[in-house]
Protein backbone atom coordinates (compact mmCIF):
# COMPACT_ATOMS: atom_id res chain seq x y z
CA UNK A 1 0.00 0.00 0.00
CA UNK A 2 1.44 3.38 -1.01
CA UNK A 3 1.59 6.43 1.26
CA UNK A 4 -1.31 7.95 -0.69
CA UNK A 5 -3.44 4.83 -0.23
CA UNK A 6 -2.55 4.56 3.47
CA UNK A 7 -3.64 8.15 4.10
CA UNK A 8 -6.84 7.64 2.14
CA UNK A 9 -7.61 4.48 4.13
CA UNK A 10 -7.08 6.36 7.40
CA UNK A 11 -9.57 9.03 6.33
CA UNK A 12 -12.15 6.51 5.10
CA UNK A 13 -11.97 4.38 8.23
CA UNK A 14 -12.12 7.41 10.54
CA UNK A 15 -15.25 8.68 8.78
CA UNK A 16 -17.05 5.33 8.63
CA UNK A 17 -15.90 3.16 11.53
CA UNK A 18 -15.80 4.16 15.21
CA UNK A 19 -12.71 3.25 17.30
CA UNK A 20 -12.80 0.36 19.76
CA UNK A 21 -12.85 2.47 22.94
CA UNK A 22 -15.81 4.56 21.75
CA UNK A 23 -17.72 1.45 20.70
CA UNK A 24 -17.40 0.14 24.27
CA UNK A 25 -18.75 3.38 25.73
CA UNK A 26 -21.80 3.40 23.43
CA UNK A 27 -22.50 -0.26 24.17
CA UNK A 28 -22.33 0.48 27.91
CA UNK A 29 -24.55 3.56 27.54
CA UNK A 30 -27.31 1.43 26.04
CA UNK A 31 -27.37 -0.76 29.16
CA UNK A 32 -27.49 2.23 31.54
CA UNK A 33 -30.31 4.20 29.94
CA UNK A 34 -33.90 3.70 31.11
CA UNK A 35 -35.66 1.37 28.64
CA UNK A 36 -38.54 2.59 26.47
CA UNK A 37 -37.64 6.27 26.78
CA UNK A 38 -36.79 8.79 24.08
CA UNK A 39 -33.13 8.66 25.08
CA UNK A 40 -33.00 4.87 24.90
CA UNK A 41 -34.62 5.06 21.48
CA UNK A 42 -31.96 7.57 20.42
CA UNK A 43 -29.14 5.32 21.67
CA UNK A 44 -30.60 2.33 19.84
CA UNK A 45 -30.73 4.39 16.64
CA UNK A 46 -27.15 5.56 17.16
CA UNK A 47 -25.97 1.96 17.58
CA UNK A 48 -27.80 0.84 14.45
CA UNK A 49 -26.37 3.79 12.51
CA UNK A 50 -22.81 2.89 13.55
CA UNK A 51 -23.34 -0.65 12.26
CA UNK A 52 -24.83 0.59 8.98
CA UNK A 53 -21.96 3.01 8.36
CA UNK A 54 -19.33 0.35 9.01
CA UNK A 55 -21.02 -2.23 6.79
CA UNK A 56 -21.50 0.15 3.85
CA UNK A 57 -18.29 2.16 4.40
CA UNK A 58 -20.23 5.42 4.33
CA UNK A 59 -19.96 8.40 6.74
CA UNK A 60 -21.30 7.82 10.26
CA UNK A 61 -22.42 11.45 10.32
CA UNK A 62 -22.95 13.68 7.30
CA UNK A 63 -20.94 16.42 9.01
CA UNK A 64 -17.46 14.99 8.61
CA UNK A 65 -16.12 18.09 10.31
CA UNK A 66 -12.76 19.79 10.15
CA UNK A 67 -10.15 17.06 9.48
CA UNK A 68 -7.47 17.54 12.14
CA UNK A 69 -4.25 15.54 11.80
CA UNK A 70 -1.68 15.04 14.55
CA UNK A 71 1.55 13.92 12.86
CA UNK A 72 4.87 12.72 14.31
CA UNK A 73 7.77 12.04 11.94
CA UNK A 74 11.40 10.94 12.34
CA UNK A 75 14.06 13.64 12.32
CA UNK A 76 14.92 14.39 8.69
CA UNK A 77 11.63 13.12 7.23
CA UNK A 78 10.24 15.38 4.48
CA UNK A 79 7.14 16.88 6.08
CA UNK A 80 6.38 19.01 3.01
CA UNK A 81 5.86 15.90 0.89
CA UNK A 82 3.67 14.36 3.59
CA UNK A 83 1.60 17.55 3.85
CA UNK A 84 0.90 17.49 0.11
CA UNK A 85 -0.02 13.79 0.26
CA UNK A 86 -2.47 14.50 3.10
CA UNK A 87 -4.08 17.26 1.04
CA UNK A 88 -4.46 14.94 -1.94
CA UNK A 89 -5.93 12.18 0.23
CA UNK A 90 -8.47 14.61 1.72
CA UNK A 91 -9.53 15.76 -1.76
CA UNK A 92 -9.78 12.14 -2.94
CA UNK A 93 -11.93 11.15 0.04
CA UNK A 94 -14.19 14.15 -0.55
CA UNK A 95 -14.72 13.25 -4.21
CA UNK A 96 -15.54 9.67 -3.18
CA UNK A 97 -18.22 10.84 -0.73
CA UNK A 98 -16.31 9.76 2.38
CA UNK A 99 -15.98 13.39 3.48
CA UNK A 100 -18.50 16.17 2.95
CA UNK A 101 -17.07 19.31 1.31
CA UNK A 102 -16.78 21.51 4.41
CA UNK A 103 -14.18 24.16 3.53
CA UNK A 104 -15.91 27.51 3.00
CA UNK A 105 -14.35 30.88 2.17
CA UNK A 106 -15.27 33.05 5.16
CA UNK A 107 -15.56 36.21 3.04
CA UNK A 108 -17.34 35.01 -0.11
CA UNK A 109 -19.19 31.99 1.31
CA UNK A 110 -17.87 29.90 -1.59
CA UNK A 111 -17.30 26.21 -0.87
CA UNK A 112 -13.96 24.95 -2.21
CA UNK A 113 -15.60 21.61 -3.01
CA UNK A 114 -12.61 19.49 -1.98
CA UNK A 115 -12.03 20.36 1.71
CA UNK A 116 -8.87 22.28 0.81
CA UNK A 117 -8.24 25.95 1.48
CA UNK A 118 -6.57 28.32 3.94
CA UNK A 119 -6.57 26.52 7.29
CA UNK A 120 -8.12 23.28 6.02
CA UNK A 121 -7.30 20.60 6.77
CA UNK A 122 -5.59 21.25 10.11
CA UNK A 123 -2.22 19.50 10.42
CA UNK A 124 -0.03 19.56 13.54
CA UNK A 125 3.53 18.38 12.78
CA UNK A 126 5.97 17.17 15.43
CA UNK A 127 9.24 15.26 15.31
CA UNK A 128 10.23 12.23 17.36
CA UNK A 129 13.24 9.93 17.47
CA UNK A 130 11.40 6.79 16.42
CA UNK A 131 11.89 5.38 12.93
CA UNK A 132 8.19 5.48 12.13
CA UNK A 133 5.54 7.97 11.03
CA UNK A 134 2.56 8.31 13.36
CA UNK A 135 -0.59 10.00 12.03
CA UNK A 136 -3.73 10.48 14.09
CA UNK A 137 -6.94 11.99 12.76
CA UNK A 138 -10.05 13.37 14.42
CA UNK A 139 -13.17 14.47 12.53
CA UNK A 140 -15.07 16.92 14.74
CA UNK A 141 -18.28 18.32 13.27
CA UNK A 142 -19.71 21.82 13.48
CA UNK A 143 -22.55 20.97 15.86
CA UNK A 144 -20.22 19.95 18.67
CA UNK A 145 -17.56 22.50 17.67
CA UNK A 146 -20.13 25.25 18.25
CA UNK A 147 -20.61 24.01 21.84
CA UNK A 148 -16.94 24.51 22.69
CA UNK A 149 -16.65 27.07 25.45
CA UNK A 150 -13.92 29.03 27.21
CA UNK A 151 -14.11 30.46 30.71
CA UNK A 152 -12.01 33.28 32.19
CA UNK A 153 -11.85 32.87 35.97
CA UNK A 154 -13.12 34.18 38.27
CA UNK A 155 -16.53 34.05 36.60
CA UNK A 156 -20.16 33.84 37.68
CA UNK A 157 -21.91 30.75 36.31
CA UNK A 158 -25.69 30.15 36.18
CA UNK A 159 -26.78 27.78 38.91
CA UNK A 160 -23.28 27.42 40.34
CA UNK A 161 -22.26 30.89 41.50
CA UNK A 162 -18.69 32.11 41.32
CA UNK A 163 -16.02 29.88 39.83
CA UNK A 164 -12.70 30.87 41.39
CA UNK A 165 -9.13 30.33 40.20
CA UNK A 166 -8.70 26.87 41.66
CA UNK A 167 -9.56 23.25 40.92
CA UNK A 168 -13.06 23.64 42.29
CA UNK A 169 -13.62 26.59 39.98
CA UNK A 170 -12.55 24.35 37.11
CA UNK A 171 -15.03 21.71 38.32
CA UNK A 172 -17.85 24.24 38.13
CA UNK A 173 -16.82 25.23 34.61
CA UNK A 174 -16.93 21.63 33.39
CA UNK A 175 -20.34 20.97 34.91
CA UNK A 176 -21.61 24.17 33.29
CA UNK A 177 -20.03 23.18 29.95
CA UNK A 178 -22.15 20.02 29.89
CA UNK A 179 -25.28 21.93 30.90
CA UNK A 180 -24.89 24.63 28.23
CA UNK A 181 -24.41 22.04 25.47
CA UNK A 182 -27.76 20.37 26.21
CA UNK A 183 -28.53 18.18 23.17
CA UNK A 184 -27.22 20.66 20.61
CA UNK A 185 -23.79 19.04 20.46
CA UNK A 186 -25.27 15.56 19.89
CA UNK A 187 -25.06 14.21 23.42
CA UNK A 188 -24.08 11.90 24.92
CA UNK A 189 -20.75 13.64 24.48
CA UNK A 190 -17.16 13.94 25.65
CA UNK A 191 -15.09 16.81 27.05
CA UNK A 192 -11.51 17.66 26.14
CA UNK A 193 -10.29 20.27 28.63
CA UNK A 194 -7.31 22.54 29.12
CA UNK A 195 -6.65 24.39 32.36
CA UNK A 196 -4.44 27.41 31.68
CA UNK A 197 -2.52 28.50 28.62
CA UNK A 198 -3.66 31.53 26.65
CA UNK A 199 -6.89 31.72 24.66
CA UNK A 200 -5.34 30.11 21.59
CA UNK A 201 -3.16 27.42 23.17
CA UNK A 202 -5.93 26.57 25.62
CA UNK A 203 -8.40 25.59 22.92
CA UNK A 204 -5.71 23.70 20.99
CA UNK A 205 -4.61 21.73 24.06
CA UNK A 206 -8.23 20.98 24.95
CA UNK A 207 -8.80 19.46 21.52
CA UNK A 208 -5.59 17.44 21.80
CA UNK A 209 -7.03 15.75 24.91
CA UNK A 210 -9.52 14.06 22.58
CA UNK A 211 -6.65 11.95 21.23
CA UNK A 212 -6.33 10.23 24.62
CA UNK A 213 -7.90 6.78 24.88
CA UNK A 214 -11.22 6.64 26.68
CA UNK A 215 -9.96 4.19 29.32
CA UNK A 216 -6.63 5.83 30.14
CA UNK A 217 -5.87 7.27 33.58
CA UNK A 218 -4.60 10.80 33.99
CA UNK A 219 -1.08 10.66 35.52
CA UNK A 220 -1.90 13.72 37.65
CA UNK A 221 -3.92 12.42 40.61
CA UNK A 222 -6.00 15.58 41.09
CA UNK A 223 -6.94 15.64 37.40
CA UNK A 224 -7.79 11.94 37.40
CA UNK A 225 -10.15 12.58 40.31
CA UNK A 226 -11.66 15.58 38.51
CA UNK A 227 -12.26 13.58 35.32
CA UNK A 228 -14.02 10.85 37.26
CA UNK A 229 -16.12 13.36 39.21
CA UNK A 230 -17.33 15.19 36.11
CA UNK A 231 -18.42 12.05 34.26
CA UNK A 232 -20.26 10.66 37.28
CA UNK A 233 -22.04 13.88 38.19
CA UNK A 234 -22.76 15.28 34.73
CA UNK A 235 -24.89 12.19 34.21
CA UNK A 236 -27.06 13.32 37.13
CA UNK A 237 -28.14 16.48 35.28
CA UNK A 238 -30.84 14.56 33.40
CA UNK A 239 -30.05 16.01 29.96
CA UNK A 240 -29.80 12.63 28.28
CA UNK A 241 -29.00 11.57 24.74
CA UNK A 242 -29.98 14.24 22.18
CA UNK A 243 -31.18 16.36 25.12
CA UNK A 244 -34.30 14.21 25.43
CA UNK A 245 -33.84 13.79 29.19
CA UNK A 246 -32.22 10.69 30.64
CA UNK A 247 -29.40 9.07 32.54
CA UNK A 248 -26.63 9.18 29.92
CA UNK A 249 -25.36 12.68 29.12
CA UNK A 250 -21.55 12.47 29.19
CA UNK A 251 -19.36 9.53 28.15
CA UNK A 252 -15.90 10.86 28.91
CA UNK A 253 -13.79 13.76 30.21
CA UNK A 254 -10.06 14.30 29.64
CA UNK A 255 -8.23 17.21 31.29
CA UNK A 256 -4.81 18.65 30.49
CA UNK A 257 -2.98 21.59 32.02
CA UNK A 258 -0.67 24.33 30.73
CA UNK A 259 1.14 27.13 32.52
CA UNK A 260 -0.59 30.51 32.31
CA UNK A 261 0.06 34.21 32.65
CA UNK A 262 -0.43 35.64 36.17
CA UNK A 263 -3.30 37.80 34.90
CA UNK A 264 -5.13 35.01 33.07
CA UNK A 265 -6.87 31.82 34.14
CA UNK A 266 -8.64 30.22 31.20
CA UNK A 267 -10.54 26.95 31.22
CA UNK A 268 -11.03 25.82 27.63
CA UNK A 269 -13.47 23.05 26.72
CA UNK A 270 -13.66 21.12 23.45
CA UNK A 271 -17.06 19.42 23.34
CA UNK A 272 -17.15 16.23 21.25
CA UNK A 273 -20.32 14.48 20.05
CA UNK A 274 -21.22 10.81 20.50
CA UNK A 275 -19.89 10.17 16.95
CA UNK A 276 -16.31 10.42 18.20
CA UNK A 277 -14.42 9.73 14.96
CA UNK A 278 -10.77 9.36 15.87
CA UNK A 279 -8.25 6.84 14.52
CA UNK A 280 -4.52 6.63 13.90
CA UNK A 281 -1.95 4.71 11.91
CA UNK A 282 1.76 4.02 12.22
CA UNK A 283 3.47 4.00 8.82
CA UNK A 284 6.75 2.64 7.51
CA UNK A 285 8.68 5.85 6.66
CA UNK A 286 10.32 4.24 3.62
CA UNK A 287 7.26 2.70 1.95
CA UNK A 288 4.25 4.46 3.48
CA UNK A 289 2.69 1.10 4.32
CA UNK A 290 0.45 0.83 7.39
CA UNK A 291 2.41 -1.04 10.07
CA UNK A 292 -0.37 -0.95 12.67
CA UNK A 293 -3.58 0.86 13.59
CA UNK A 294 -4.16 2.94 16.71
CA UNK A 295 -7.42 2.89 18.71
CA UNK A 296 -8.23 -0.50 17.17
CA UNK A 297 -8.36 -3.61 19.37
CA UNK A 298 -8.71 -7.23 18.21
CA UNK A 299 -11.56 -7.89 20.63
CA UNK A 300 -13.58 -4.74 19.84
CA UNK A 301 -17.37 -4.85 19.77
CA UNK A 302 -18.17 -5.37 16.09
CA UNK A 303 -21.95 -5.00 16.27
CA UNK A 304 -23.54 -2.38 18.51
CA UNK A 305 -27.24 -2.62 17.64
CA UNK A 306 -29.39 -4.75 19.91
CA UNK A 307 -32.70 -3.59 18.43
CA UNK A 308 -34.19 -1.85 15.44
CA UNK A 309 -33.62 1.81 16.36
CA UNK A 310 -37.07 3.38 16.18
CA UNK A 311 -39.39 0.57 17.22
CA UNK A 312 -42.60 1.48 15.43
CA UNK A 313 -45.84 0.37 17.07
CA UNK A 314 -48.49 1.60 14.66
CA UNK A 315 -49.40 4.48 17.00
CA UNK A 316 -47.04 6.89 15.24
CA UNK A 317 -48.28 10.03 13.53
CA UNK A 318 -47.65 9.82 9.78
CA UNK A 319 -47.21 13.10 7.88
CA UNK A 320 -46.90 13.71 4.16
CA UNK A 321 -46.82 17.13 2.49
CA UNK A 322 -48.91 19.13 1.89
CA UNK A 323 -49.92 19.03 5.57
CA UNK A 324 -53.08 20.77 6.76
CA UNK A 325 -53.46 23.02 9.79
CA UNK A 326 -55.89 20.55 11.36
CA UNK A 327 -53.47 17.65 10.96
CA UNK A 328 -50.46 19.49 12.36
CA UNK A 329 -52.36 20.76 15.40
CA UNK A 330 -53.22 17.17 16.30
CA UNK A 331 -49.49 16.45 16.79
CA UNK A 332 -48.23 16.79 20.36
CA UNK A 333 -44.78 17.03 21.88
CA UNK A 334 -43.63 13.50 22.65
CA UNK A 335 -45.28 11.91 19.61
CA UNK A 336 -43.22 9.74 17.30
CA UNK A 337 -43.75 11.24 13.84
CA UNK A 338 -42.94 9.44 10.59
CA UNK A 339 -42.46 11.50 7.43
CA UNK A 340 -43.21 10.17 3.95
CA UNK A 341 -42.99 12.01 0.63
CA UNK A 342 -41.09 15.21 -0.15
CA UNK A 343 -38.85 17.11 2.27
CA UNK A 344 -36.72 20.13 1.34
CA UNK A 345 -33.38 20.71 3.03
CA UNK A 346 -32.44 24.17 4.24
CA UNK A 347 -29.54 25.33 6.39
CA UNK A 348 -27.92 28.68 7.18
CA UNK A 349 -27.51 29.98 3.62
CA UNK A 350 -31.01 28.92 2.54
CA UNK A 351 -32.66 30.52 5.57
CA UNK A 352 -30.86 33.81 5.07
CA UNK A 353 -31.67 33.77 1.35
CA UNK A 354 -35.35 33.00 1.90
CA UNK A 355 -35.70 36.00 4.20
CA UNK A 356 -35.17 38.22 1.15
CA UNK A 357 -36.22 36.06 -1.83
CA UNK A 358 -38.93 33.67 -2.97
CA UNK A 359 -38.51 29.91 -2.82
CA UNK A 360 -37.82 27.97 -6.03
CA UNK A 361 -40.40 25.39 -4.87
CA UNK A 362 -43.82 25.71 -3.23
CA UNK A 363 -43.29 25.38 0.52
CA UNK A 364 -46.95 25.68 1.59
CA UNK A 365 -47.75 22.74 3.87
CA UNK A 366 -44.20 21.43 3.45
CA UNK A 367 -41.52 19.80 5.58
CA UNK A 368 -38.21 21.67 5.92
CA UNK A 369 -35.17 19.65 6.97
CA UNK A 370 -32.13 21.22 8.64
CA UNK A 371 -29.62 19.02 6.84
CA UNK A 372 -26.44 19.31 4.79
CA UNK A 373 -26.20 15.89 3.12
CA UNK A 374 -23.27 14.10 1.54
CA UNK A 375 -24.05 13.78 -2.17
CA UNK A 376 -22.31 12.07 -5.08
CA UNK A 377 -23.24 12.02 -8.77
CA UNK A 378 -24.28 8.83 -10.53
CA UNK A 379 -22.96 8.12 -14.06
CA UNK A 380 -26.31 9.25 -15.52
CA UNK A 381 -26.03 12.65 -13.83
CA UNK A 382 -28.56 11.93 -11.08
CA UNK A 383 -27.67 12.34 -7.42
CA UNK A 384 -27.07 9.71 -4.75
CA UNK A 385 -27.53 10.60 -1.09
CA UNK A 386 -24.63 9.17 0.91
CA UNK A 387 -25.45 10.60 4.36
CA UNK A 388 -28.35 12.71 5.60
CA UNK A 389 -28.58 13.31 9.34
CA UNK A 390 -29.84 16.56 10.91
CA UNK A 391 -27.77 19.63 11.70
CA UNK A 392 -28.09 21.76 14.85
CA UNK A 393 -31.21 23.89 14.54
CA UNK A 394 -30.36 26.70 16.95
CA UNK A 395 -28.42 28.53 14.23
CA UNK A 396 -31.69 29.14 12.40
CA UNK A 397 -33.44 30.65 15.43
CA UNK A 398 -33.19 34.25 14.11
CA UNK A 399 -34.98 33.23 10.89
CA UNK A 400 -37.20 30.22 11.52
CA UNK A 401 -40.45 31.79 12.72
CA UNK A 402 -40.36 34.33 9.88
CA UNK A 403 -39.69 31.63 7.29
CA UNK A 404 -42.52 29.47 8.63
CA UNK A 405 -44.94 32.39 8.44
CA UNK A 406 -43.79 33.63 5.05
CA UNK A 407 -44.02 30.28 3.24
CA UNK A 408 -46.56 28.27 5.27
CA UNK A 409 -44.17 25.51 6.34
CA UNK A 410 -45.84 22.96 8.62
CA UNK A 411 -42.94 20.90 9.98
CA UNK A 412 -39.27 21.60 10.65
CA UNK A 413 -36.87 18.69 11.19
CA UNK A 414 -33.55 19.22 12.94
CA UNK A 415 -31.73 18.43 16.16
CA UNK A 416 -31.15 20.13 19.48
CA UNK A 417 -34.36 22.15 19.47
CA UNK A 418 -35.10 25.83 18.97
CA UNK A 419 -35.93 28.83 21.12
CA UNK A 420 -38.78 31.01 22.26
CA UNK A 421 -39.20 32.95 19.00
CA UNK A 422 -39.61 29.76 16.98
CA UNK A 423 -41.97 28.29 19.58
CA UNK A 424 -44.22 31.34 19.26
CA UNK A 425 -44.07 30.98 15.48
CA UNK A 426 -45.14 27.34 15.70
CA UNK A 427 -48.16 28.38 17.76
CA UNK A 428 -49.09 31.33 15.57
CA UNK A 429 -48.76 29.65 12.20
CA UNK A 430 -49.57 26.03 13.04
CA UNK A 431 -46.32 24.06 12.76
CA UNK A 432 -44.18 21.60 14.71
CA UNK A 433 -40.50 20.94 15.35
CA UNK A 434 -39.39 17.34 14.86
CA UNK A 435 -36.14 16.14 16.41
CA UNK A 436 -34.26 13.60 14.32
CA UNK A 437 -31.37 11.67 15.89
CA UNK A 438 -28.20 13.71 15.44
CA UNK A 439 -25.34 11.93 13.72
CA UNK A 440 -27.56 9.10 12.43
CA UNK A 441 -26.63 9.87 8.83
CA UNK A 442 -26.91 6.31 7.50
CA UNK A 443 -30.15 5.58 9.33
CA UNK A 444 -31.75 8.58 7.63
CA UNK A 445 -30.07 8.33 4.23
CA UNK A 446 -31.54 4.83 4.06
CA UNK A 447 -34.96 6.54 4.15
CA UNK A 448 -34.15 8.65 1.07
CA UNK A 449 -35.63 6.84 -1.91
CA UNK A 450 -34.83 9.51 -4.49
CA UNK A 451 -33.23 12.92 -4.95
CA UNK A 452 -35.80 14.89 -6.95
CA UNK A 453 -33.77 18.06 -7.45
CA UNK A 454 -31.39 20.66 -6.09
CA UNK A 455 -31.42 24.47 -6.00
CA UNK A 456 -28.62 26.99 -5.36
CA UNK A 457 -25.92 24.32 -5.63
CA UNK A 458 -23.48 26.57 -7.48
CA UNK A 459 -24.09 29.49 -5.14
CA UNK A 460 -24.04 27.69 -1.80
CA UNK A 461 -22.23 24.35 -2.32
CA UNK A 462 -23.38 20.84 -1.42
CA UNK A 463 -24.04 21.24 2.33
CA UNK A 464 -25.92 24.55 2.02
CA UNK A 465 -27.91 23.94 -1.17
CA UNK A 466 -31.65 23.23 -1.07
CA UNK A 467 -32.11 19.54 -1.86
CA UNK A 468 -35.51 18.05 -2.62
CA UNK A 469 -35.55 14.56 -1.13
CA UNK A 470 -38.21 11.90 -1.42
CA UNK A 471 -38.32 9.89 1.81
CA UNK A 472 -40.14 6.91 3.26
CA UNK A 473 -40.37 5.95 6.93
CA UNK A 474 -38.35 8.96 8.16
CA UNK A 475 -38.84 8.63 11.94
CA UNK A 476 -38.56 11.58 14.35
CA UNK A 477 -39.81 12.75 17.74
CA UNK A 478 -41.96 15.88 18.03
CA UNK A 479 -40.27 17.99 20.69
CA UNK A 480 -42.01 21.34 20.05
CA UNK A 481 -45.66 21.55 19.04
CA UNK A 482 -48.19 24.18 17.97
CA UNK A 483 -49.64 24.41 21.50
CA UNK A 484 -46.62 25.94 23.22
CA UNK A 485 -45.05 22.73 24.50
CA UNK A 486 -41.27 22.32 24.28
CA UNK A 487 -39.31 19.33 25.57
CA UNK A 488 -36.08 21.33 25.13
CA UNK A 489 -37.32 24.16 27.37
CA UNK A 490 -38.41 21.65 30.00
CA UNK A 491 -35.11 19.72 30.01
CA UNK A 492 -33.11 22.95 30.13
CA UNK A 493 -35.08 24.10 33.18
CA UNK A 494 -34.86 20.78 35.02
CA UNK A 495 -31.13 20.36 34.29
CA UNK A 496 -30.42 23.92 35.48
CA UNK A 497 -32.15 23.05 38.74
CA UNK A 498 -30.04 19.90 39.05
CA UNK A 499 -26.90 21.91 38.25
CA UNK A 500 -27.56 24.02 41.33
CA UNK A 501 -27.00 20.94 43.51
CA UNK A 502 -23.31 21.11 42.59
CA UNK A 503 -22.66 24.68 43.74
CA UNK A 504 -20.97 23.72 47.02
CA UNK A 505 -17.17 23.21 47.00
CA UNK A 506 -15.83 19.71 46.41
CA UNK A 507 -12.08 20.16 45.83
CA UNK A 508 -11.39 22.72 48.56
CA UNK A 509 -11.14 26.50 48.44
Q: Where are these predicted regions, by residue range?
A:
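Non-transmembrane, aqueous-exposed alpha-helical and coiled segments at domain scale
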Residues: 1-193, 198-310, 403-405
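Glycine-rich beta-strand-to-loop/alpha-helix junction loops that act as flexible
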Residues: 191-198, 340-341, 415, 438
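Feature captures the catalytic cores and cofactor-binding loops of soluble hydro-lyases/lyases
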Residues: 212-245, 345-474
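C-terminal binding/interaction regions
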Residues: 245-253, 260-262, 446-509
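Short, structured beta-strand/loop micro-motifs enriched in basic residues and often containing a Trp
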Residues: 313-323
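Short, well-ordered loop/turn sites that connect or cap secondary structure elements
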Residues: 330-331, 337
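Short, charged beta-turn/beta-strand-edge "cap" motif at the junction between a beta-strand
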Residues: 336, 342-346
Amino acid sequence: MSLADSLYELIVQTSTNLPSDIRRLIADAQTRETPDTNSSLALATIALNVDMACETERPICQDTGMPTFLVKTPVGYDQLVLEEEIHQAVARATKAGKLRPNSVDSLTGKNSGDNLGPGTPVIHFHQHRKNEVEIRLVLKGGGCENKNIQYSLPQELPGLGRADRNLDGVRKCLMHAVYQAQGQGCSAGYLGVCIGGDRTSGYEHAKLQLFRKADDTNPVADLAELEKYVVENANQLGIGTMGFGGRVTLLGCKVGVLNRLPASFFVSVAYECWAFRRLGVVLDPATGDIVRWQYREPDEIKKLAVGAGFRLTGREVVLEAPITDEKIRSVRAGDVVVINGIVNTGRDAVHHHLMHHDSPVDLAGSVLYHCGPVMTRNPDGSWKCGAAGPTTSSREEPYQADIIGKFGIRAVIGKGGMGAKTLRGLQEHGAVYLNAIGGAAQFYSDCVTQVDGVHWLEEFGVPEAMWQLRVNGFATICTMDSHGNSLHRDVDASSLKELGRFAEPVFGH
